[in-house]
Amino acid sequence: MKNVKKRVGVVLLILAVLGVYMLAMPANTVSAAGVPFNTKYPYGPTSIADNQSEVTAMLKAEWEDWKSKRITSNGAGGYKRVQRDASTNYDTVSEGMGYGLLLAVCFNEQALFDDLYRYVKSHFNGNGLMHWHIDANNNVTSHDGGDGAATDADEDIALALIFADKLWGSSGAINYGQEARTLINNLYNHCVEHGSYVLKPGDRWGGSSVTNPSYFAPAWYKVYAQYTGDTRWNQVADKCYQIVEEVKKYNNGTGLVPDWCTASGTPASGQSYDYKYDATRYGWRTAVDYSWFGDQRAKANCDMLTKFFARDGAKGIVDGYTIQGSKISNNHNASFIGPVAAASMTGYDLNFAKELYRETVAVKDSEYYGYYGNSLRLLTLLYITGNFPNPLSDLSGQPTPPSNPTPSLPPQVVYGDVNGDGNVNSTDLTMLKRYLLKSVTNINREAADVNRDGAINSSDMTILKRYLIKSIPHLPY
């Protein structure tokens, strides 16, 4: 009996010590458990899903499927890596490691995150940035300068490390916070053109003569500035917007950006000037800056993109355009649909946004070419369902407002919702008809102006009727 009492006493003592330890743990180690994040974006819609109650199960199923195809320990030096697909002989690019780390932290898989990050660190070059191309046997490629860095990858890796620090704390085997700060410093020193703040596409080339708008991630840079205190990153974000303003001189109002350009928005020598597989990511990276920080430049640019793609509907999106808007390809795939859905998060057209959400869920690329499009698809699904919060916010509740918040914006408009009940159906058509006959006066006037010409008349009624019988794909039209 004495031994039993002694054991009970020891157990109680251990529990008491653990209780004190738990109370002493830093708050950011227990602030959240990943998907589903119980947060709300401070600006614009938080989710464009049709049924939010189904989102978590869908995302977790997609995550398990993605891991089964993309995560491998083969050729990873004892760690784990993100492999591409059969079309590239299952190699690894640093871009994919950035995507994998963002996904792993959002789905709260710390062990996987650590394995992926250790692989990343095993492939740091002399500038403290990741080799951009490694073959399936863990060899850095030489034919394409694989030992250099790709800026978009390292900026995603840095953001993932900040997420990790805020979700899990930095007192474990990996000091995520220190790793993030070091990487962010290396990025600034080697991937930003000094004097101009132009984002270089890599640590060994580019700048004002050639840059890549799909690498522009202004929300990331604002987080870096707040996290490290290095406010030069805010100037990098501003320069990204300035370059896109230059592009607008040449894109005929489409909002489309090229794969590559100069800092003056003109074609870069020897590089694609079309909206193709690089440029497709621009809407995703830019829209996040509106959701997190309310930047009106992000909203304006993404609203233009949404308006352009709405003309053909979600099912009409293809995998290549001139920046003036002419189609140059006809494949309909995940690489292009998800990022357009992300762009719609600035709230220009919520009817079209929901159409884009459904198409993003529905369209998944075949596995032979599955790496790129399906990775972007899952990342954008996280964002457009409210599961990609600012890592510097309270990840367990409401986001912390920006330090200099912009004025609150008016509610987003659901065009066609004439009676204001949140739906667009025949009741709205009847209400609009009664309004035109002057039998009612109290309607949702902005939503009733479905052609956005500033007037409510029979043209709006015709367009709403055509939308309800599905002869036009979206509102406004």
UniProtKB/Swiss-Prot annotation:
Alphabetical list of PROSITE patterns matching this protein: CLOS_CELLULOSOME_RPT (PS00448), DOCKERIN (PS51766), EF_HAND_1 (PS00018), GLYCOSYL_HYDROL_F8 (PS00812)
Domain Dockerin positions: 411-477
Pfam families referenced in this protein's UniProt entry, alphabetically: Dockerin_1, Glyco_hydro_8
Organism whose genome encodes this protein: Acetivibrio thermocellus (strain ATCC 27405 / DSM 1237 / JCM 9322 / NBRC 103400 / NCIMB 10682 / NRRL B-4536 / VPI 7372)
Assigned protein family: Belongs to the glycosyl hydrolase 8 (cellulase D) family.
Source species, domain of life: Bacteria
Active site: E95, D152
Entry EC number(s): 3.2.1.4
Signal peptide location: 1-32
GO biological process: cellulose catabolic process
Matching CDD domains: Dockerin_I (cd14256)
Protein name: Endoglucanase A
